[in-house]
Amino acid sequence: MKDLLNLFNQQRQTLDFDAIKIALASPDLIRSWSYGEVKKPETINYRTFKPERDGLFCAAIFGPIKDYECLCGKYKRMKHRGVVCEKCGTEVTLAKVRRERMGHIDLASPVAHIWFLKSLPSRIGLMLDMTLRDIERVLYFEAYVVTEPGLTPLERRQLLTEEQYLTARQEYNDDFDAAMGAEAVYELLRTIDLQSEMTRLREEIASTGSETKLKRLTKRIKLIEAFLESGNRPEWMVMTVLPVLPPDLRPLVPLDGGRFATSDLNDLYRRVINRNNRLRRLLELNAPDIIVRNEKRMLQESVDALLDNGRRGRAITGTNKRPLKSLADMIKGKQGRFRQNLLGKRVDYSGRSVITVGPYLKLHQCGLPKKMALELFKPFVFAKLQRRGLATTIKAAKKLVEREEAEVWDILEEVIREHPVLLNRAPTLHRLGIQAFEPVLIEGKAIQLHPLVCTAFNADFDGDQMAVHVPLSLEAQLEARALMMSTNNILSPANGEPIIVPSQDVVLGLYYMSRALENKKGEGMVFANTSEVKRAYDNRVVELHAKVKVRITQVDVEAGGKRSSGTSIVDTTVGRALLSEILPEGLPFQLANTEMTKKNISRLINSSYRLLGLKDTVVFADKLMYTGYAYATRAGVSIGIDDMLIPDEKKGILTEAEAEVLEIQEQYQSGLVTAGERYNKVVDIWSRTSERIAKAMMDTIGTEKVENAKGETIDQKSMNSLYIMADSGARGSQAQIRQLAGMRGLMARPDGSIIETPIKANFREGLNVQEYFNSTHGARKGLADTALKTANSGYLTRRLVDVAQDVVITEIDCGTTEGLIMTPIVEGGDVVEPLRERVLGRVVAEDVYLPGNDEEPIVTRNTLLDEAWVAKLEDASVQSVKVRSTISCESSFGVCARCYGRDLARGHQVNIGEAVGVIAAQSIGEPGTQLTMRTFHIGGAASRAAAVDNITVKTTGSVKFNNLKSVAHASGSLVAVSRSGELSVLDGHGRERERYKLPYGATITAKDGDAVKAGQSVANWDPHNHPIVSEVAGFIRFIDFVDGVTVIEKTDELTGLASREITDPKRRGAQAKELRPIVRIVDAKGNDLTIPNTDLPAQYLLPPRSIVNLQDGAAVGVGDVVAKIPQEASKTRDITGGLPRVADLFEARKPKDPAILAERSGIISFGKDTKGKQRLIIKDTDGSEHEELIPKYRQIIVFEGEHVTKGETVVDGEPSPQDILRLLGVEPLAAYLVKEIQDVYRLQGVKINDKHIEVITRQMLRKVEIVDQGNSKFLNGEQVERQRVIEENARLVKRNELPAKYDPVLLGITKASLATESFISAASFQETTRVLTEAAVRGTRDNLRGLKENVIVGRLIPAGTGLAYHAGRRKASGLTDSEMETLSGKPAAAEPVAAVADAGADEE
């Protein structure tokens, strides 16, 4: 019995470890694992099917084939356990030892390990400081290498050809050693003295000057350091002993018909053994050198193939021309060990079936077919049958169940009661793809799903299937109920808005019952309460849509739970009064006293959750659903072709458009417009026409004329079925109705460009052949896109999950005072996202004061901003708030709850242990399939919209300038002379309502603080010309203006005014190379004037194509335009949109022609140009200069003498995120990434909370680059985890030594995932071979901190309820061994359960 206990303990010990280390195996270690040498290539005897002795399946080496039975059958049964049979050499033990016992092959000649040879950078090459090419020549016997030069002039590691070798031998006899093949490499590696090599390299680094040499040296130093630290020896990279995998991991299975199916590994091993034995024989026979060499080369090749087939040369193929699967292939890729078996396991206890709708279910229920339930809950049913005494044995119980006796169903009912099951729909794109429900037994074979959870599962009932899983253990059931129950997941983790929102039929029903119509039966009646309304409605006294007055009782629930009620008479309709009956107590009636569109219903559910909590909201959502279905059925809404009303104006609008197009066509033929302009204008006309027809159509469908009670004819919203559906948000949108009843409009070609002939017909009129063809053209592209999109989106999600998987909330507060400053997001003057939405659910980083009052803070630091606080901020008209962010969080592992803020799916501060990284990745990846795949060509409407030439304010208020430099013009208006200036309009409370960019040279007619009215124009500029504005008053002097060389005189035919255009330097000829046309401003005496506040002369360098309208010597005032540069009609830069754009941002890719930013603050001047580049100089205030060479074709948007600040754009283009980080720092980079990514999602109408993007950004900024190593162990230019540097610096500061200085580095998500501290996580992501090679050389320890590593080693993850288990283990490791054993037996089961109970408590 004691033995048996020991046996179990033996199994248990392996589970208890804190880290995994990977290293090179030494020959002695390999021998110590081995249970014997495999000497023969034979596998099994074809007659007896018994393994051959000393073969690849030998029982003496690997263990018995049957449990407790030796091969020859002499010893059988347990009593002989541990005996080694003297006849056949087999140990009598369990057969499963054949899965763990290894063998070995003694190689007759050393063999280089291909991973360390060929996996770049080649480790053997770095170690020996030889090129891979050279080492391969030695290994494959093409050249000799000097291993020991002795006293000869030869160098160690020098290559010699056959002839050179013979000459050297004759010359120096035996004074030197040279060899070829792996022995030579082995010898070289063996004789390296790492310590002295290290010292030598460090000295060399100090003395070297060249960049490339430095790189090579630091690489070598790092490698040698790794070997010294890990205790690996370099010669172990060349193998002398080869381990043999246990036979049950490379099985040989007999098929029927006497053939065998075998693992490819057996073939590969057989090859190695054959060649090895042959080589051994040849060496014994003293065969000629050339034969031995050939055999050694073949041995090297066969071992290469075994380890990594196809890495070098052609892959070895089997009988069926298919490359054999080597050991490396076993672990890498989607089908490899990591991704197939360790990260994704299959589940028993599951069933799947088609889903149908279950409109009568409650939100926490699902309908489970009886047959399915019986099969899934079989063991529970068996147990219960036995306990009841209805069956004596399991076998009897089985019979009962198979016969499906009546009592079995009763017992099934009992078993199922309060035992939740998990429903999952593939693809599981976010955590709401698996939810728990209580099963309700139903007849039939389809699972019934509650309609309200369809949005979360993205399910519909056109044949979707779902899987059911049964949580078995008590802990699993508890977690399913407390955390995964559908009733606990009302809010979406992506944006914190309700995801349990009615859609389609339900919305239609609620909308229908809440519409108000004129002059319906019973209009104007007054009712005492809602039940009276109901009675009147049931007796057909009033109609559903009649406007009536009703006395409503309002119940207000205050924060303390006190209830107070009051009554009031409300103007409402019959339908809304009936709706008020299902409102929970405490929800104000005015929320429901509107038209119930999808948006309003969502708002209603949200308010209910915030005001009344979870339980009431769930009940309310269910009631809404039942009511919606009931009234949708009553409404009997249906659509026919007559509902698609075509507006009468359509014909007229089309005729107008056609005339316009014809006119442009004529202009084009007479050469007035270019082909591109013609195309753009035509597309423009048609998109405008399409809009006009759509508007006319919506007016036609959406309104109808009726008589009201007074007999007047008025317009009211129509009850057209088509319109109702779109207006309520039940199905369809304006864009789709436009195609049914307006005009189909412009179509896109598959490459995304727009076909200029639109489809003028709509679907009701029908398309003609050509229109139909154009229509299918675009539609087919759409379908092809969708298929590609799914794969791309999935891959993006995988990369995101991988980079963020180990971000977990680990503590409450890290104590940082850093944060991000949040302001409203403004686009084109409109506030797209007000401040309230951006700061909701965040924690304040520093006290917020009233604007202009620094005494009493409105909100103090570390307050979590909920809806009430945000309303307060809005009333105080605060414009910017500094909030805590995960990017600036200082927790050493994971992030802290304060920096993260509110858990969006629960509505309170996030719990410790929440896996926020994975949630962030899912929230960003899940809507990926809704994003577009195409790049937009700007043209037509888009470029028209770009040409804004003034600012007209939309609201009444006061003007405020931000960051604006301006000069006062003689006319009294201001002229902007900065690029980043902005103008805001504030309302009476000082709240920002609009914000606009002010371009350089804009004339501003309002002053700071002026009052403006809505519709007033406050600034204007010429969008087609970029002005150069004089900042001083004086007289013009032209310099280097040579007529016909640098300038051309032009006279305008219409006005007769003369102007000068600067020519292109390329066309000036050789003698004019040095000429640079400049306009200088001088005073009356002809002395140079300087630009205010600088010592630079007031002169403006004129770029090519600029136009000067003034004459030499003319007087200019401050703010006058000296010259102007025509802008090309809106650059047609393709903007990458949709998914590719998001991927580019997360991968931190540099754009093609990036914007050039100012490297420092200072004054701009231009130096001497080179052939294709112009030289831009920024002069600092302290006189130091920075030069930048810029290609001529790029447009420089700054002028000589202008002041720029560090990081300001100097040359237009898409900014590169690396530049933003380098010049402006982490916060602006975060702001940029968040803004750009949000823009893409916002365009598709997807809401994602900023903090998810911030979590990913934090992971992209994990690494830093060492700029100055100080006294640390890092090297200059090395990239290290930020955390390690911070720890090391803290250590150095304690000892009063110099800490290392570093700069943050931005890595793309793929790079960042591969650069994690955990090699297990990196290897299971991508490039498995490279990661493992690197890790083995370094002897890396994986501390199993992330989620992925723990999944792979088969433990609970250190997040959620698993965090308690890990904390328990850490505490426990301080205990004695015996106590440790009791713990490891049943890993602290009490703890996770307790944690779940707590979690459940704050759910309510």
UniProtKB/Swiss-Prot annotation:
Gene3D superfamilies: 1.10.132.30, 1.10.150.390, 1.10.1790.20, 1.10.40.90, 2.40.40.20, 2.40.50.100, RNA polymerase II, clamp domain, RNA polymerase Rpb1, domain 3. Zn(2+) 1 binds at C70, C72, C85, C88. This is DNA-directed RNA polymerase subunit beta'. Keywords: DNA-directed RNA polymerase, Magnesium, Metal-binding, Nucleotidyltransferase, Transcription, Transferase, Zinc. It comes from the Bacteria. InterPro entries: DNA-dir_RpoC_beta_prime (IPR045867), DNA-dir_RpoC_beta_prime_bact (IPR012754), RNA_pol_asu (IPR000722), RNA_pol_N (IPR006592), RNA_pol_Rpb1_1 (IPR007080), RNA_pol_Rpb1_3 (IPR007066), RNA_pol_Rpb1_3_sf (IPR042102), RNA_pol_Rpb1_4 (IPR007083). GO terms for cellular component: DNA-directed RNA polymerase complex. GO terms for molecular function: DNA binding; DNA-directed RNA polymerase activity; magnesium ion binding; zinc ion binding. GO terms for biological process: DNA-templated transcription. Mg(2+) binds at D460, D462, D464. Disulfide bonds: none annotated. DNA-dependent RNA polymerase catalyzes the transcription of DNA into RNA using the four ribonucleoside triphosphates as substrates. Binds 1 Mg(2+) ion per subunit. It comes from Xanthomonas euvesicatoria pv. vesicatoria (strain 85-10) (Xanthomonas campestris pv. vesicatoria). The RNAP catalytic core consists of 2 alpha, 1 beta, 1 beta' and 1 omega subunit. When a sigma factor is associated with the core the holoenzyme is formed, which can initiate transcription. Belongs to the RNA polymerase beta' chain family. Residues 1387-1404 have a biased composition (Low complexity). It holds the Pfam family RNA_pol_Rpb1_1.
